[in-house]
């Protein structure tokens, strides 16, 4: 099962650390994949959920590509990743599901059970995760032993 730290969170939401590069690296070093929010502004890529906060570059992304689930936050980011297909990326807003570039089913919170999907924040809706292939959570550590 894929265990994905939502914006780098492991044991609960720490909003001021979300999407911070070192926070992401900490989650990866603990063995988790990480969902990150990224946008393109001009020629630059930035991590950050609501605003561009942390500038990153191609090399930063490529060094972590096997552990990242990249949520494109604007069309420009989606176009950039579409030209750099080696990454696992997706776009969604309030869709029930979306397909990531690697073919995974990314399911909106509260929409489970969906066979072979990634459950997003299942703890919020007490989702049935028995058919999921992965979980993305702010509390991902609690799923490690389940």
Where are these regions (language model features)?
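Phosphate-group recognition and catalysis centered on beta-loop-alpha active-site segments
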Residues: 1-146
């Amino acid at each position: 099962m894929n265990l994905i730290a939502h914006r780098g969170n492991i044991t609960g939401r720490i909003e001021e650390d979300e999407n911070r590069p070192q926070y992401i690296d900490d989650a990866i070093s603990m063995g988790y994949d990480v969902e990150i929010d990224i946008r393109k502004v001009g020629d630059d890529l930035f991590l950050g959920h609501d605003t561009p906060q942390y500038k990153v570059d191609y090399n930063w992304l490529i060094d972590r590509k096997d552990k990242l689930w990249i949520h494109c936050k604007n069309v420009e980011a989606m176009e950039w990743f579409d030209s750099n297909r080696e990454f696992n990326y997706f776009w969604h807003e309030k869709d029930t599901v979306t397909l990531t570039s690697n073919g995974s089913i990314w399911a909106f919170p509260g929409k489970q059970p969906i066979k072979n999907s990634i459950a997003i924040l299942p703890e919020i809706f007490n989702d049935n995760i028995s058919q999921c292939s992965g979980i993305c959570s702010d509390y991902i550590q609690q799923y490690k032993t389940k």
